[in-house]
Each structure stands twice: as structure tokens, then as C-alpha cells.
Regions:
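Structured, hydrophobic secondary-structure cores that serve as assembly/anchoring elements
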Residues: 2, 7-238
Length: 238
């Protein structure tokens, strides 16, 4: 998680260069909060986003986007904005156009929504190229999956490199991924662990290959609701 410098207004946010990384997210603007002594303080966006992600994980899985009115609430700040050149905090309520501009530049906007309060309204990563990893929910799914696969594979170290071992580890991977399908993390998956990817040369190098392809679930970020007017009685005839 990274913040746009809190002494900058919206006007030049998109011009500031930030490292490209599939596991990095940038958020704007800064937040108005209070310290342990009850004094007002301006804190970086990460101060709120880390808490938002933690709260999201309490009610859902890591592959659910920590954004929007259901899981993206900012609960440890009273306003969002930036510090101006006079050192004063300027509150900002980003409108739709401003949010879209930020999001198209891979900056996740934090804004005030009537009825919901402060909300994180983005989940893009700083991925250099367009891919499933340009979204936080998919990046967190990959992190989780790599950890689980590492745990899954360790018991098979030093086991005989034969069909029985390959079938066992494939069955374990299939079970893990099938569970993720049920938990709305994956649309589909494919696991290969046989003679096609475990060639004699690889076996002679004491290697076992478990190739996995996944189709991660994407989050809804845009909803289109066309409304069409029909003449009286026309709908009944459809």
C-alpha cells in the first residue's frame, strides 16, 4: 500500500510517478483522524486502508475486493483531503469524474458517499500491463494460493518420484482449487502432473512439476442499467 503525498491536491496527482508492481496499490487522498490523545491529525491513506482490508477479511475472503459500500468503509477517519500550501487540511469529496480520472491512472480513490460515509472506491494495483493481477483481489488470491500450494507440496519432498506420488499431489491440488471455486475465488482451473510435464530428464534431476492454470473471479466495478420506455401494451406483446 502506498499513498500519494498528502500535501498535494488532486490537480497533479496523476503526474506523480510510482513504482510499477502487481502487489502495490496507491490510494488518494489522505485522511483526517485523531491520535491516542484525542488530537486531530492528518494521516496517509494507508492508515485507513490497512484497517479496511483487515475488516474486509473478517467478513469475507482475501479474494473479495476490499472496496465499495459493503467492505470498503473507512472507519478510523472523519474526512478525506490534503494539506494545502498554508499547512491547513482541505477536505475533498471526490465526484464521479474525479474518481474516474484517478482510477484510470491506477490510483484508488477514497471518497465520501451519502449514506455510507468514507469509502475506498478502488482496487487497482500498479501492474505495468493489463492482466488479472492489475486488481487487488486477484493479487491477494495469488498470494494466498502460493502459500497454500507451498504447504501442500512440502510433505512430498523426498517421496518416490513416481505415478503414485504424482497422482497424490495432483489430487491434493484439485481438492484445494475445487474448494476455492466454491468460495468464489475461481471460475475454473486445470492441474497437470503426469508424464507430459514430468519427463525422464526432469525425474533424473529429482524434480517434480505440478502445473496449474487458474481463471480468477473478477470483481464488478461498473454496472450498466439501460432504461427503455415502451408504448402502452407493447411490453405485454413481447
Amino acid at each position: 500500500i502506498r499513498d500519494v503525498h498528502m500535501s498535494r491536491g488532486l490537480g497533479d496527482v496523476h503526474k506523480r510517478q510510482v513504482t510499477s508492481n502487481e502487489y502495490l496499490g496507491v490510494f488518494y487522498p489522505s485522511l483526517f483522524s485523531s491520535d491516542n490523545a484525542g488530537k486531530n491529525v492528518v494521516v496517509p491513506a494507508s492508515h485507513g486502508i490497512i484497517r479496511t482490508i483487515a475488516l474486509s477479511d473478517q467478513v469475507s475472503f482475501p479474494w473479495f475486493a476490499p472496496a465499495g459500500t459493503r467492505r470498503g468503509g473507512i472507519t478510523n477517519a472523519s474526512a478525506a483531503g490534503f494539506i494545502n500550501d498554508e499547512g491547513e487540511f482541505n477536505s475533498v469529496a471526490l465526484n464521479t469524474g474525479q474518481r474516474d480520472t484517478l482510477y484510470s491512472n491506477k490510483i484508488n480513490p477514497i471518497t465520501f458517499l451519502t449514506g455510507s460515509g468514507l469509502v475506498n472506491f478502488g482496487q487497482k494495483t500498479r501492474a505495468a500491463n493489463a492482466s488479472a493481477l492489475d486488481r487487488i483481489n486477484v493479487a491477494r488470491l495469488v498470494i494466498y494460493l502460493r502459500s497454500q500450494l507451498d504447504k501442500l507440496a512440502k510433505p512430498y519432498i523426498f517421496e518416490p518420484n513416481d505415478k503414485i506420488t504424482r497422482d497424490e499431489i495432483k489430487a491434493q491440488a484439485d481438492s484445494l482449487l475445487l474448494e476455492l471455486v466454491g468460495q468464489r475465488a475461481l471460475y475454473d482451473f486445470l492441474v497437470v502432473c503426469d508424464e507430459s510435464n514430468n519427463t525422464p530428464a526432469r525425474i533424473d534431476r529429482n524434480e517434480l512439476y505440478l502445473d496449474i492454470a487458474i481463471e480468477p473471479v473478477k470483481a464488478v466495478e461498473f454496472i450498466f442499467i439501460p432504461l427503455r420506455l415502451k408504448n402502452t401494451g407493447e411490453i405485454a406483446g413481447l
